[in-house]
Amino acid sequence: HPTLRRQRQMCIRDRYPVPPRAETQGRTEEYIGTWFKKTGLRDSYVLATKAAGPNPEFHYLRGGPRFTKEQLVEAVNGSLRRLQTDCIDLYQLHWPDRYTNFFGQRGYFHREQPETPIEETLRALEDIVQSGKVRAIGLSNETPWGTMKFLELADREGLPRVDSIQNPYSLLNRTYEIAMAEVSHREDVGLLAYSPLGMGLLTGKYRNGAKPEGSRMVVFERFTRYEGAETWEAAERYLQLADDHGI
């Protein structure tokens, strides 16, 4: 794919780690695995991917993805096969296996639904790490409570600690600064910020109602977390500031 080729060339030029991938992006895992096999550069890069959490949209993954031991082992093995490698440097849980507010939800409203206990998930990840298939574990789209629960159980039970969290962070989404930043600093859980350009709003390509062909907001219309009027106003003010300074 032309875009992936450009990304790989940038990684080689600037010595970036390989951008984190995910089980939900299996075709991209295959592209990266094929590239590693062709170039022999696997050991030169940090390789990260994620296991999908529960979501009816992904019913085709493992019969409905959860973070049980059986399912995580299946997910890891699938990613290893697509990536054509024997070890993943950083393995992350893509979103929580419980009902909570993530993916742009601002308020928390409790709802009872099936969930895999965090300790069960951590013990499954411990077995996977000890098997040599994964070097380190991380979280994604997680809350301060969830992150601290993982850390508390790890410290109390002698289980692997999470090393990173991949949450959104940009000029348009600074929710990470509310509690999560302190958790990261005090507990040594590094941030891998995603969506730093607010799904492209901060590039200016959507200015004046433009919807470029093939852009994220056209291809993924259901992703509406940056669709609020206040968000568009803030983006425009940032873009005007950039224009004023020639950047």
Q: How does the language model describe each region?
A:
Residues 1-12:
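Single conserved hydrophobic/aromatic residue that forms the stacking wall/gate
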Residues 96-247:
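Beta/alpha (TIM)-barrel catalytic core signal, keyed to glycine-rich beta->alpha loops juxtaposed to Asp/Glu
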Residues 39-66, 94-97:
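Structural motif corresponding to the early beta-alpha repeats
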Residues 9, 67-82, 118, 122-123, ...:
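Short, acidic/polar
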Residues 33-46, 81-84, 129, 151-160:
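Acidic (Asp/Glu)-rich catalytic clusters
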Residues 13-35, 97-105, 109:
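Glycine-rich, proline-tolerant flexible connector loops at the mouths of alpha/beta enzymes
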Residues 58-73, 107-116:
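Active-site mouth loops of central-metabolism enzymes
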